[in-house]
Amino acid sequence: MTDPILRRPILLGGLGLLLMRRGEAAVPVDGTLRGVLERVYIGWSEAMRRGDLTGFSRHTSRYRQMCLRNEVVSLRQPWPRAVFRGIVQAPPLQGLTCVDAAEHGDTARLAYFGRVDFGLDAAGVENPVVLRFLREADGWKFDWIQYVNLGRDEAARQALRRGERKWLESPQFRLTGEYPEVPKPCREPYQVAGLSVVALGCRVTVELNGGVHRETVENDTGGRVITGGLRKGVNSVAIQPEVLAGASDVRLQVAVLTRQGKAAKELWKWSPSEPAGQWKPRYDTTIFVKSAAVVR
């Protein structure tokens, strides 16, 4: 399954465009908020390390617990035991430099810079990592991790060593202030499947089976396990594409994949027949599952 600790890594090769001018003073980190959020994260990471379901439930947001539950069930894995089987470990905060602690409404974040160790091998080059939190009735809860790969952008690393945080103003790191709607629990799928999306120069929202699974990708590639998988018979698909302003090289493809042994098998693929400037605001189609891994 997708690891419960880490969402899809973010690649920010152009982060240097957002950096402040050399010599500009960094704003001090909110020490009080940092302390509160770090205690939540440490409690969560300890629960993950021990396989402690009670501790995991206490420190994890209700929203994330339901997202993970649906993902595990959609893979036909045992809930909640499968949550503790991920090979990625919660990175320790020791040795990392905290560059930001912020809250807005019911959302909060901690941002760090350094050699982030997920336990896969020796920590490599320095990169940023952002910890996300949601506020509930009894306090802050851990939600998810954003890991940022700077690639070869050494100018960005130099600025981050000085405490730069301008990059946190980009859309993928902003705090919405709102607690997300907790999804409804899904049922075990007839066919386990994943969605693969290529949306370059455009933004697309894909919904399956009336919104049981909903995913938006903007100027990127994406995809994850389909919530509830595919049903036997007709599966509805709604695709809402939009070309981004100023985009010249536009590509859109949506595919549904499953796994046969160690190899991925493409069950279904769609692209708009019209050129990018003539796309409809919405396309409705279907995937018909005749039997497991047999689609027409």
Feature locations, PLM:
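Periplasmic plug
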Residues: 203-211, 215
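Exposed aromatic-hydrophobic patches
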Residues: 222-228
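N-terminal export signals
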Residues: 2-3, 8-25, 215-218
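Short, well-ordered alpha-helical segments enriched in acidic and aromatic residues
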Residues: 50-77
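Surface-exposed, charged secondary-structure patches
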Residues: 77-130
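Stable alpha-helical elements in mature extracytoplasmic
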Residues: 37-40, 52, 56, 129
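Hydrophobic pocket/interface hotspot
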Residues: 44, 55-56, 110, 133
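Beta-strand-rich recognition domains
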Residues: 32-35, 42-49, 61-62, 117-126, ...
